[in-house]
């Protein structure tokens, strides 16, 4: 699956008057892919970003594994609570902190930081798409991790899978190849 050409979004701060959710995407939710158009078209900002992890190609979509020690929080069924958790950690993750590699064989995974307005409306369809069912067995988990966007480090939600993985490890950290 190849993305179509979609320009980066940068809108003015007036769009951020209400609560927003920060989401790191690395697969079919990236700009130019059909799921982006369906679920993220209302994004108020999209920027290139990276996270430490391992990216696997599962064919039609990728899976991300992140180091357990980088997980700041686990997503819930309450978008308002998740916005509050994100804000809490944003106050404690220094914006200019070095994005140091965790112990182990982790790679930088490349994707996009997407800022979505109205989390109460935006998160439930994304959770459904990703098979995230808080408190139940789920295909993906939504977790809060530090991401690097330019020279800034900030917390963002990301959908991760727990192994074992049957796909091919993408050591270059990009999907599709």
Predicted features and spans:
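Glycine-aromatic micro-motifs
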Residues: 2-177
């Amino acid at each position: 699956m190849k993305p179509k050409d979609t320009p980066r979004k940068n809108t003015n701060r007036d769009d951020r008057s209400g609560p927003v959710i920060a989401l790191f995407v690395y697969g079919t939710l990236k700009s130019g892919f059909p799921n982006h158009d369906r679920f993220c078209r209302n994004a108020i900002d999209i920027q290139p970003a990276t996270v430490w992890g391992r990216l696997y190609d599962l064919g039609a979509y990728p899976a991300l594994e992140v180091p357990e020690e980088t997980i700041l929080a686990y997503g819930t069924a309450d978008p308002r609570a998740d916005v509050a958790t994100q804000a809490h950690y944003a106050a404690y993750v220094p914006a200019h902190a070095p994005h140091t590699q965790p112990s182990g064989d982790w790679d930088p995974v490349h994707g996009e930081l997407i800022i979505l307005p109205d989390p109460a409306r935006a998160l439930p369809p994304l959770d459904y798409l990703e098979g995230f069912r808080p408190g139940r067995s789920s295909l993906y988990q939504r977790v809060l991790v530090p991401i690097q966007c330019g020279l800034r480090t900030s917390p963002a939600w990301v959908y991760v899978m727990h192994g074992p993985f049957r796909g091919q490890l993408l050591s270059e950290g990009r999907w599709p190849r």
